[in-house]
């Protein structure tokens, strides 16, 4: 009595134990196969054989072994397609003991389930690409558009995952090819043709973005800047009496928190993420302290004699005396804030000026490998300038005064740069004297300032790729 026929377990036995030439396949209809599943077969393999199990007509005795008699005649090629097709597509599932024929997902390097949309891909990446091309696909990378996409981190950034799908050659037309030309595509995939189509797609997408940016009205651009504004950051006020270490610790913690929000703010400026990664990083490295300072001035504009570093950190001039060398910087910040107050700086003007500081900080050679990025940057600067001119014109003052006001606002930017340089020197001095420890993004920005003249390419801090740090 055989409760588990070898035929059901994919073993071939001879009809006569002494005659190996007359081997035949035997199969049992016993349901005991469901009671005691062989341990060496995967659940996916058993699932593939389920249809054959239910197709039998249980007319034989309980334990009698009889030749395999399928209800429908199935050829070898049909079985091969069924085993390797939609029901059990994975090469690993069809033969658990061998990885020789295994294919890997071109996007995340997981085991591929089949040839989808023109490339080998897993079920997860296939479904993600299908959702992206059929519906929502306006993803934004919260880091620097170079997130690592692998089996464990493929869900961390949708924008970089979709970009990699296009880079490896996934395309809409691939959905039909995988059904009708599977074997031909498997043997004769033309990678150069796929890359060429991807390049054409990227070029077309770039042209569309440029057209959309050029058609954005100044009002729409300013509204986008308004929506991109980062939230207020809270930091604990040091307890009195203030010391040099406690004061600098509070200021550096605040700066590090604001830097994280600044990266998200920059990426929301229309057209910024279309610049090369090199230019994006260099712009942020060059102006981060200027952006922080003009934000401080805007928060302090209605509080004469006070510097509103944060809602819970308000300092006056005398409280800066405890830190060596910072009093001069406090005086510069208070003087510029007073000048903005005299000009009655409006919120929309402040938004445009802050964006202009970021985009006009290119006091370095831009990426020679990507001249298009340089052209995009100049175009983006023109868009910001037009927005500032529009905001001033909307104030209703005479045209001659509009020109004078624009000049007055732009002239203050050089003073902001000067205060930023002073602040950078002071912060580096405090760091070298070990007055206060510096970590994370703030340390990266300081190192970039120190090594700017010695390196050829920007260095990105690991935090730039941590999606959890950037709320875009």
Curated annotation (Swiss-Prot):
GO terms, biological process: cellular response to estradiol stimulus; estrogen receptor signaling pathway
GO molecular function: nuclear estrogen receptor activity; sequence-specific DNA binding; steroid binding; zinc ion binding
Domain NR LBD: from-to ranges: 217-449
CDD domains linked to this entry: NR_DBD_ER, NR_LBD_ER
Alphabetical list of SMART domains matching this protein: HOLI, ZnF_C4
Subunit structure: Binds DNA as a homodimer. Can form a heterodimer with ER-alpha.
Name of the protein this chain belongs to: Estrogen receptor beta
Species the sequence originates in: Coturnix japonica
Highest classification ranks of the organism: Eukaryota, Metazoa, Chordata, Craniata, Vertebrata
């Amino acid at each position: 009595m055989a409760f588990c026929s070898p035929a059901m377990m994919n073993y071939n036995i001879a009809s006569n134990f002494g005659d190996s030439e007359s081997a035949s396949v035997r199969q049992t209809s016993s349901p005991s196969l469901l009671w005691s599943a062989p341990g060496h077969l995967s659940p996916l393999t058993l699932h593939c054989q389920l249809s054959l199990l239910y197709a039998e007509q249980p007319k034989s005795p309980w334990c009698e072994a009889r030749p395999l008699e399928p209800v429908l005649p199935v050829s070898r090629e049909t079985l091969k397609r069924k085993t390797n097709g939609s029901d059990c597509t994975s090469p690993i599932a069809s033969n658990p003991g061998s990885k020789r024929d295994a294919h890997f997902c071109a996007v995340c390097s997981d085991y591929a389930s089949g040839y989808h949309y023109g490339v080998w891909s897993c079920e997860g990446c296939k479904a993600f690409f299908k959702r992206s091309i059929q519906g929502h696909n306006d993803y934004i990378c919260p880091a620097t558009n170079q997130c690592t996409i692998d089996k464990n981190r493929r869900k961390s950034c949708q924008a970089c995952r979709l970009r990699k799908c296009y880079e490896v050659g996934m395309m809409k037309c691939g959905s039909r090819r995988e059904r009708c030309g599977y074997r031909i595509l498997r043997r004769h995939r033309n990678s150069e043709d796929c890359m060429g189509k991807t390049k054409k797609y990227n070029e077309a997408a770039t042209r569309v973005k440029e057209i959309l940016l050029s058609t954005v009205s100044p009002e729409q651009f300013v509204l986008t800047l308004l929506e991109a504004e980062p939230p207020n950051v809270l930091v604990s006020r040091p307890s009195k009496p203030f010391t040099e270490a406690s004061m600098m610790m509070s200021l550096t913690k605040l700066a590090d928190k604001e830097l994280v929000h600044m990266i998200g703010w920059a990426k929301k400026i229309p057209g910024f993420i279309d610049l090369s990664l090199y230019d994006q990083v260099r712009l942020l490295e060059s102006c981060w302290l200027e952006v922080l300072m003009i934000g401080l001035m805007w928060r302090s504009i209605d509080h004469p004699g006070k510097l509103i570093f944060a809602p819970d950190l308000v300092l006056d001039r005398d409280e800066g005396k405890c830190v060596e060398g910072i009093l001069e910087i406090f005086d510069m910040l208070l003087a510029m804030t007073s000048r903005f107050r005299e000009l009655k700086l409006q919120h929309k003007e402040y938004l445009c000026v802050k964006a202009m500081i970021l985009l006009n900080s290119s006091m370095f050679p831009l990426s020679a490998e990507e001249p298009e990025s340089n052209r995009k940057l100049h175009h983006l600067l023109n868009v910001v300038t037009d927005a500032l001119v529009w905001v001033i014109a909307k104030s209703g003052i005479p045209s001659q005064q509009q020109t004078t006001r624009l000049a007055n606002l732009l002239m203050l930017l050089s003073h902001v740069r000067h205060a930023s340089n002073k602040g950078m020197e002071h912060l580096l001095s405090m760091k070298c004297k070990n007055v206060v420890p510096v970590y994370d993004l703030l340390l990266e920005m300081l190192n970039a300032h120190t090594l700017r003249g010695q390196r050829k390419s920007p260095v990105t801090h690991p935090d730039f790729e941590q999606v959890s740090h950037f709320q875009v």
